[in-house]
């Protein structure tokens, strides 16, 4: 009976003895993965694994007893089995570390998410890839008479402002992102909609293509195009032409910062304001600020008047020949005849900055003097590029009410902080709120500062999204594995979030102000630069005619 039992046991464990390496590897792999199972998996496989473990332990026990306590010699297969068992564990560790990432990717790809789950938050890495796809098109094909074309959205569908009259528009973005493309597109449409277009560009010599776009539209509509260079030595217009004494005084006081200011320094500029009023009442028709400065400089600086500050400002403006022409362009006629004026300014020299502010202030005065009660004034579109160099109190006040006089502004700047960089006679926070409140149409290109990105993200509104929570477990091979179960919770996110605003490529912006915010791609109107477009009309050969007028020096009030 003993021999029969031994024979039965030997036959039972014979497969292991004959193939110790195969069963050793399988045993090591099986033990490793059983130990790696999580609690839920162990419960599911409890019966099967218990059976396998029982059989395995019985086999090994019998083999060990027969080898060490009987004449049956199977030590060599046992050594091979033990080595293979360890090798199986090592192979399992290596396999799990390599296979888990691949399996998780396959599971993620094949998993169909719940249809009730909302969209999640954005990933800036994926956004940059998606938004970098350029959409090429000809904007002229989409322009309509009674609507304003903005550009194509990310679905290649045109975006329009469905109003015949455009409101104030704000364009924000750093240099090189495409602000000029949107402004030139709007300017082109303003001309073909029979509006007067005035562009003031703070870049020296102006933009390379913007004047050409304006000229192209003017040629199409049979309108006059005028190019003005503030830095030129050629006399081009008289800033005081057709201006009343009150208008001249208000213009000089506002641009020269002579009025009351938040810092209280305006109290000490009373004598300068007195001289400004004196100039406004005494300047003769056809006379320029340069002429008046030359004739009355000593009078301003005298001990009786003590208006050296005003004299310095006036002397500075007198050096800008472009706005001191006794005969030249008529701003009144340009507005009345709905013509186009492109002004190339400069930002590096204070006298040119003041000249730009004077010019803009005078344009505002001419717009506001038109009758808007018994007739509807023609529309005037004023585009201000890098308009922080053109800010004055007159402009700030006009932004609130000038739409009633048939005008709208398109202002461009680089960041929200530019709006607080104002002259000393203005409050930066008040001006900031004025611009942000009255410019309901906004176009923002790539944001490079957090303040601007966060503001426009908040302005786009909020949507409900789902935040996903997953559990990560560490396996026996020290490999992290994402659990199959996940939790989804409702949260809020900006419709156009900060990641989108930071990832916008060139020629791509976010459009706000007409329904939901949209991604818009703006392509340029094709033009070729030419010297003829930038030719400046020279009025210096015209005969100077100054209307005689008696000046009463004693009457300075």
Predicted regions and their residues:
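Conserved ATP-driven motor cores of ASCE-family P-loop NTPases powering translocation/secretion/packaging/pilus
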Residues: 408, 413-514
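P-loop NTPase motor domains
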Residues: 2-6, 10-23, 28, 32-40, ...
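Short, flexible active-site loops
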Residues: 55-57, 344, 382, 438
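Basic- and hydrophobic-enriched, low-structure N-terminal and domain-boundary segments
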Residues: 1-175, 181-186, 511
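Generic hydrophobic alpha-helical membrane-span motif
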Residues: 73-74, 207, 420
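N-terminal short leaders/motifs
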Residues: 142-148, 286-293, 465-469, 475-476
């Amino acid at each position: 009976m003993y021999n029969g039992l031994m024979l039965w046991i030997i036959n039972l464990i014979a497969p292991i003895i004959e193939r110790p390496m195969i069963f050793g590897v399988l045993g090591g792999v099986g033990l490793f993965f059983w130990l790696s199972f999580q609690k839920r998996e162990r419960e599911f496989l409890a019966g099967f694994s218990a059976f396998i473990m029982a059989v395995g332990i019985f086999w090994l026990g019998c083999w060990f007893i027969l080898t060490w306590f009987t004449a049956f010699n199977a030590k060599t297969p046992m050594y091979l089995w033990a080595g293979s068992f360890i090798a199986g564990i090592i192979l399992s560790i290596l396999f799990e570390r390599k296979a888990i990432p691949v399996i998780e990717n396959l599971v993620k790809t094949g998993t169909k998410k719940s249809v009730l789950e909302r969209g999640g938050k954005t990933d800036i890495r994926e956004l940059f890839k998606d938004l970098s796809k350029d959409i090429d098109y000809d904007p002229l094909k989409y322009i309509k008479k009674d609507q304003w074309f903005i550009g194509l959205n990310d679905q290649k569908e045109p975006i329009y402002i469905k109003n015949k009259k455009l409101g104030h528009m704000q364009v924000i973005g750093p240099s090189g992102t495409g602000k000029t493309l949107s402004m030139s597109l709007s300017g082109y449409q303003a001309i073909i909609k029979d509006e007067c277009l005035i562009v003031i560009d703070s870049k020296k010599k102006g933009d390379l293509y913007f004047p050409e776009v304006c000229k192209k539209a003017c040629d199409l509509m049979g309108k006059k195009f005028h190019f003005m260079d503030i830095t030129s030595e050629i006399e081009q217009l008289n800033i005081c032409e057709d201006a009343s004494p009150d208008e001249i005084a208000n213009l000089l006081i506002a641009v020269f910062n002579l009025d009351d200011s938040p810092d209280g320094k305006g109290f000490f500029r009373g004598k300068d304001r007195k001289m400004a009023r004196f100039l406004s009442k005494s300047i003769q028709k056809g006379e320029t600020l340069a002429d008046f400065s030359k004739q009355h400089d000593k009078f301003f600086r005298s001990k009786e008047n003590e208006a050296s500050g005003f004299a310095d400002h006036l002397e500075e403006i007198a050096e800008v020949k472009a706005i001191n022409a006794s005969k030249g362009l008529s701003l009144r006629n340009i507005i009345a005849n709905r013509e186009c004026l492109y002004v190339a300014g400069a930002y590096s020299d204070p006298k040119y900055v003041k000249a730009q502010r004077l010019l803009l202030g005078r344009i505002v005065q001419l717009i506001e003097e038109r009758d808007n009660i018994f007739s509807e004034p023609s529309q005037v579109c004023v585009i201000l590029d890098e308009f922080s160099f053109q800010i004055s109190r007159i402009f700030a006040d006009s932004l609130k009410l000038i739409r009633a006089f048939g005008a709208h502004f398109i202002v461009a700047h680089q960041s929200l902080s530019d709006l607080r960089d104002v002259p000393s006679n203005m409050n930066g926070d008040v001006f900031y709120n004025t611009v942000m409140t009255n410019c309901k149409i906004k176009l923002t290109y790539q944001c490079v500062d957090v303040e601007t990105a966060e503001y426009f993200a908040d302005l786009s509104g909020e949507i409900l999204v789902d935040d996903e929570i997953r559990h990560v477990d560490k396996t026996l091979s020290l490999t992290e594995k994402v659990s199959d179960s996940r939790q989804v919770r409702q949260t809020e996110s900006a419709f156009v979030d900060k990641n989108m605003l930071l990832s916008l490529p060139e020629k791509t912006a976010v459009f706000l102000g007409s329904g939901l915010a949209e991604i818009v791609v703006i392509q340029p109107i094709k033009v070729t630069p030419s010297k003829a477009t930038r030719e400046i009309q020279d009025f210096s050969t015209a005969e100077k005619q100054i209307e005689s007028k008696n000046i009463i020096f004693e009457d300075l009030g």
